[in-house]
Design a protein with these regions (language model features):
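Mature catalytic core of soluble alpha/beta enzymes
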Residues: 1-391
Length: 391
């Protein structure tokens, strides 16, 4: 996409960063295009004299570390650190995948309804954080919604909708109130009704019924980026971008003199087009939407993001982008805000000033989109004027 530059920028445009647009698109095109994904295949490696990229495949998607060209003269050490960061993502997949029978999470799901299961400390911390976000988002983010996801996957294969009875049965298994932590952590995770064995280990997890399962698909990719970022930070790398799939990214420092890393925002109506560009610095970003994953039944479109409170796909939003201090938070909250809508997003962001969001509802007419900006600084945003009207 080429952003319009046929008119000289006004002072207002300049203060909003419009005068930087041509430079941002030129220097950051590849890094931004990485977020557009399959619609722009074949993907171009972002190495056009500006970056070095190292990538791997894990968690059914692509992960990449992107470094500035300042490392091009002697990239060996930075690339070793980048490789170490990507290797960790594979180890985390071996721990968290629910599609592999011997991972720690799969073993937890099989056993936790019958006995306490001790889990690795960092995984336990992630589960505690997931429970906090579940509570803070009023159940709109729920890592126990796997039974609903499995039901809808089955219905899609059978070209039908779930019955009311099927949904009701699955909903009895959904909710983090069914996941029990040790008594000593009651206050930290904010639970009111935890009553496990007082002799349980500090990182024990139990389920209160058969059929409950944890699926970290809506937070695990971001968590993997956060853990990979720890390695880069420990080595004092100050300018890099970590990308997980086409929806999650975390960035540090600046990109070749720009005030951040340019990241492309996909148009949810026309996935092959870029809706705009956001400059990301020392933050994480995640986007949730149903532009790619959906199915149709009897003429109606059903997206893949399920409201765990009702069991039905959410229809109120086209896409939601969240900026947060960590990629795990951004991942989880983009899903929660997609489900909970503008009111939840505004309420959450007002209570968590380090979190901001862009929500894109369906257009009232035509294909002109009107994003709802909750706290994202305007100087970070560069919209495609063809798709987003100027205020």
């Amino acid at each position: 996409m080429s952003l319009p530059s046929d008119q000289p920028p006004s002072r207002r445009d300049f203060l909003a960063g419009r005068a930087l647009r041509d430079e941002i698109v030129t220097v950051g095109q590849a890094a931004g295009d990485a977020m557009l994904g399959e619609a722009n295949e074949p993907r171009r490696e972002p190495t056009s004299g500006a970056t070095i990229r190292l990538a791997t495949s894990a968690m059914a998607t692509d992960f990449a570390v992107i470094l500035n060209e300042a490392h091009r003269d002697d990239p060996r050490q930075p690339l070793r650190w980048a490789s170490e960061a990507l290797d960790l993502i594979h180890l985390l997949e071996d721990q968290m995948s629910v599609y592999r029978p011997n991972t720690e999470l799969s073993q937890l799901n099989r056993a936790a309804a019958s006995r306490p299961v001790q889990v690795e400390e960092r995984l336990f911390e992630l589960l505690c954080r997931a429970r906090e976000i579940w509570r803070e988002t009023e159940g709109c983010f729920d890592p126990t919604s796997g039974p609903l996801i499995a039901l809808w996957r089955q219905c899609r294969k059978e070209v039908r909708l779930p019955t009311d009875l099927e949904l009701a049965e699955r909903l009895t298994l959904v909710g983090m109130q069914h996941v029990m932590f040790p008594r000593s952590l009651t206050l930290r995770v904010g639970s009111e009704k935890l009553s496990p064995d007082s002799e349980s280990q500090a990182t024990d997890v139990t389920f209160d019924r058969d059929g409950v399962e944890l699926n970290l698909g809506s937070i695990g990719k971001g968590y993997a980026l956060d853990r990979a970022a720890e390695i880069l930070n420990e080595q004092n790398l100050t300018e890099w971008l970590l990308q997980g799939g086409h929806s999650s990214v975390i960035a540090r420092g600046s990109h070749n003199g720009l005030p951040g890393w340019p990241v492309g925002l996909r148009n949810p109506l026309l996935p092959q087009r870029r809706l705009g560009t956001i400059l990301l610095r020392d933050q994480a970003l995640a986007t949730s939407g149903t532009a790619v994953q959906h199915f149709r039944f009897e003429g109606k479109r059903y997206g893949h993001i399920i409201d765990p409170r009702t069991g039905w796909p959410t229809e109120n939003m086209l896409s939601v982008t969240v900026l947060a201090p960590t990629a795990a938070e951004a991942d989880a909250l983009s899903t929660a805000f997609f489900v909970g809508g503008v009111e939840l997003a505004e309420r959450y962001c007002s209570n968590h000033r380090s979190v901001s969001a862009l929500l894109i509802p369906p257009p009232t007419g035509g294909q002109r989109l009107e994003p709802i900006n909750i706290g994202v600084p305007e100087e970070m945003l560069f919209w495609n004027d063809e798709d987003v009207p100027r205020p």
